[in-house]
Amino acid sequence: MIPSVITAALTCVALIVTVCVFPQKKIGKTNISVYAAVPTIGAVFALITGQVSLGDVLEYFTLSAANSPVKIIILFISMSLLSVYLDETGFFEYIAHLAVKKTNGSQAGIFVSLYVTASVLTVVTSNDIVVLTFTPFICQFCKRCSINPVPYVFSQFVAANTWSLLFIIGNPTNIFLAQSVDTDFLSYFSVMWLPTVFAGVASFVMLVAVFKNSLKQKIVPIEDEYVLKERSFTFVGLAFLVFCTVSIAVLPYFELEMYYVSAFFAIALFVTVIVMRAVKRQRPTVVLKTLSRAPFEMIPLVLGMAIIALSLNKNGVTQAICSLIGEEDPALKYGVLSTLSANLLNNIPMSMIFADVTGYLSGDVLQKAVYSSIIGSNIGAYLTPLGALAGLMFTSILSRHGVKFRFTDFMKYGFIVAPVTLAAALAGLIIIL
């Protein structure tokens, strides 16, 4: 048991340190995500030292269950490809320009507009995509208008990691935890809609309270126009994303798994675009750019952490944790512990470990534990930058754009907004369950 705990702890610490210090290394013209290799090294060490057997790993990876790591990776990457494609066509920037244009120079209006826009786009895509595409736009916009970007960038980060609770596909951590109890799209939504609404309202109210004094000054609106250069390709991508989401929602009626559908739509989109480009005698540049931005680093990251989580499970660590937590007040306990653990381990390792921990529960206690852990995995992302990989990338983007937003600044706002939002979300969950 102890070797497994030490391996897991060292791997999580090394992962966070690597992301903070040197997350990427440029080899030629390609940026390699160094941090993704850390869990793989930890997993190999666990195998070599006999903490888990190769047979156990192969059996786990070939599971027919919905929470198979391979299925989760396919689902996440294919959904990400659909979203990244839209970003490559300029869709997100176009929507952001429209949102800002309607505010007539009011900072409060811009604040509300960007929060709502980030929330809506998160619901139809995913939190990581919105954070990584919206943050540079907001930084550039605020620089041109000579206004403080912090209220806007932090609010869209909070919006993305709050409204990502609504659908199972909104965050990979939702998928890890929900699929561990074979939850489908509609079953997930039927539970999480109220906690998400409660959390969304609470987070917005807290953000307004924190930043209201910074939003009183009027600014001169920028009159430039942003036009989608190739509307047909944008509409095709949007149609595929919408149809994919709807198809995933009705899957229970056809006994199909989510990863089949998402992979089909991602492949079908690329084939369609390649054919459209070929007809126009153009290179499929947008497809190549989309593939170059795909989160393939999730493959070694997830597989490595899955092996480490399996080692903890096989050596009785997760069962011991479950016994230690107990079965009283599961929503409160797992909600708070998952939020804190996400900021000690990062939310992806945390969700994989908690999926195993909750596996020893049953009935109503299991449901409350799983869904409250999902809430913690999302809201924990804005308690500190360590809560999610997107948080660390978020601070890196701000640094590259010259925005002064230190670790302590993030925590100052996070410790005000996150606890209230967490309490609201858990209250909604307790009402539903």
Residue spans for each PLM region:
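Hydrophobic transmembrane alpha-helices of multi-pass small-molecule transporters
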Residues: 1-84, 194-200, 204-314, 413-433
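Membrane-helix interface "capping/anchor" motifs
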Residues: 20-33, 143-151, 345-346
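Membrane-core helix-loop-helix motifs of multi-pass transport proteins
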Residues: 1, 140-232, 365-366, 393-427
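Hydrophobic alpha-helical transmembrane segments
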Residues: 8-17, 55-58, 104, 133-149, ...
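Membrane-embedded alpha-helical segments and adjacent helix-loop junctions characteristic
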Residues: 58-147, 284, 297-363
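Transmembrane helix-bundle signature of multi-pass membrane transporters/permeases
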Residues: 116-119, 137, 154-164, 192-197, ...
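Re-entrant/interfacial helical elements at transmembrane boundaries that shape
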Residues: 95-96, 129-140, 153, 166-181, ...
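Helix-loop-helix module between adjacent transmembrane segments
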Residues: 79-87, 105-109, 117-127, 158-167, ...
